[in-house]
């Protein structure tokens, strides 16, 4: 117990300061600290995942909804996305289920984004993720992120193997086109 005059003791001050830091660090903020996402369009189908890190008040009461926005006017052209989610007190993973794209004019805009909205009685958060085409370098990276969240490590290895083999074939072809022929032994 603290005695009168014990607050002059540096050890007691240090202990009280440390308890204050721990109490402040474990205080429930009721909002995510940060999030990561991986959303990709492959064969005219959107798939993605959003992972949130932080402290959530009660994961069971969070309601999630997601929308795909296409083009410049985000409110005019939007399409609902089905969401599956699992959450704990410190992190949440929301999978955007495969959704076929429907473009209003028949052509595909270049800039898609997915919006995940989480709501409960006393908090409301919106997370916007860019969506990339699978044929672009960022699309490959987002696809790898999505597969990592799903835990599909076999598919990740297939992509890396395909990239490695493709790079080897392209490099050899460029060397042959430039006139370099490897010496024979």
Swiss-Prot record:
Localization per record: Host endoplasmic reticulum membrane
Disulfide bridges in this chain: 39-129
Topology feature Cytoplasmic, residues: 171-185
InterPro entries from the UniProt entry: US10
Known glycosylation sites: 111, 143
Membrane topology term: Single-pass type I membrane protein
Side Lumenal, residues: 25-149
Lineage: Viruses, Duplodnaviria, Heunggongvirae, Peploviricota, Herviviricetes
Function, in words: Plays a role in the modulation of host immune response by down-regulating the surface presentation of HLA-G molecules. Selectively targets HLA-G molecules for degradation by a mechanism distinct from the one used by US11.
Signal peptide: 1-24
Top-rank lineage group of the source organism: Viruses
Primary localization class, coarse: host cell
GO CC term, one of those recorded: host cell endoplasmic reticulum membrane
Segments traversing the membrane: 150-170
The UniProt record lists the keyword Plastid: no
Protein name per Swiss-Prot or TrEMBL: Membrane glycoprotein US10
Organism of provenance: Human cytomegalovirus (strain Merlin) (HHV-5)
Keywords: Disulfide bond, Glycoprotein, Host endoplasmic reticulum, Host membrane, Host-virus interaction, Immunoglobulin domain, Membrane, Signal, Transmembrane, Transmembrane helix, Viral immunoevasion
The Ig-like H-type domain, residue ranges: 30-133
Family (UniProt): Belongs to the HHV-5 US6 protein family.
């Amino acid at each position: 117990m603290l005695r009168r005059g014990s607050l002059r003791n540096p050890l007691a001050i240090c202990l009280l300061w440390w308890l204050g830091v721990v109490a402040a660090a474990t205080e429930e903020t009721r909002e995510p600290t940060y999030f990561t996402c991986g959303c990709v369009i492959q064969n005219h189908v959107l798939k993605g995942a959003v992972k949130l890190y932080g402290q959530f008040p009660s994961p069971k009461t969070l309601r999630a909804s997601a929308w795909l926005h296409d083009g410049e006017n985000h409110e005019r052209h939007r399409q609902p996305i089905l969401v599956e989610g699992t959450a704990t007190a410190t992190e949440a993973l929301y999978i955007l289920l495969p959704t076929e794209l429907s473009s209003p004019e028949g052509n595909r805009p270049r800039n898609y984004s997915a919006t995940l909205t989480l709501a409960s009685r006393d908090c409301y958060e919106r997370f916007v993720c860019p969506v990339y085409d699978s044929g672009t370098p960022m699309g490959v990276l987002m696809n790898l992120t999505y597969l990592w969240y799903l835990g599909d490590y076999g598919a990740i290895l297939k992509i890396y193997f395909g990239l490695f083999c493709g790079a080897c074939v392209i490099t050899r072809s460029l060397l042959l086109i430039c006139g370099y022929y490897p010496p024979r032994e």
